[in-house]
């Protein structure tokens, strides 16, 4: 009998020069301001990317023709400290409600005007060994640039 595949999580963090509540708000309500509109899985061109700010809310891409594509579902909503999403994208970067890797984002005040943002993307095993490893490698390369876009927008809009 084969041992279950264990796939290492992806961990990324950034210190944002912005107060805690603002840092959380930019990550969630301000998604269109920092997420690259050419970086999507649904119909193109993308007009906006948004997060429904509640438990059970969705991360959505909205195309210029109004087509909505769900990327993730929020399974934990604790503003301004934490949110967790089930990432519903397959290894071919297509929406797939059967995929269930998770993105856990924590926000911790680091003084009155700074926030430590820690992102954990894990549970790639739920995708199967080969697709899970492929997704893990892709997001390990992708999240650093995305988190940098986010940090720049949070700091710019906090000034």
Describe the predicted segments one by one.
Residues 28-32, 79, 148:
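Solvent-exposed alpha-helix faces
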Residues 30-71:
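Short beta-edge strand/loop motif at the mouth of beta-sheet-based domains
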Residues 49-50, 64-114, 122:
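Hydrophobic-ligand binding "helix-grip"
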């Amino acid at each position: 009998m084969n041992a279950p595949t264990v796939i290492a999580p992806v961990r990324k963090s950034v210190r944002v020069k912005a107060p805690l509540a603002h840092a959380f708000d930019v990550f969630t309500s301000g998604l269109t301001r920092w997420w690259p509109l050419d970086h999507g899985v649904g119909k193109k061109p993308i007009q906006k990317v948004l997060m429904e700010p509640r438990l059970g809310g969705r991360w959505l891409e909205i195309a210029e023709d109004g087509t909505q594509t769900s990327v993730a579902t929020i399974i934990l909503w604790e503003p301004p400290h934490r949110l967790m999403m089930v990432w519903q994208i397959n290894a071919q970067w297509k929406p797939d409600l059967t995929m269930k890797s998770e993105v856990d984002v924590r926000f911790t005040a680091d003084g009155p005007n700074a926030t430590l943002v820690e992102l954990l993307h894990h549970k790639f095993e739920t995708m199967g060994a080969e697709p899970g490893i492929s997704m893990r490698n892709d997001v390990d390369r992708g999240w650093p640039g995305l988190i940098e876009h986010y940090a720049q927008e949070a700091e710019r809009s906090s000034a």
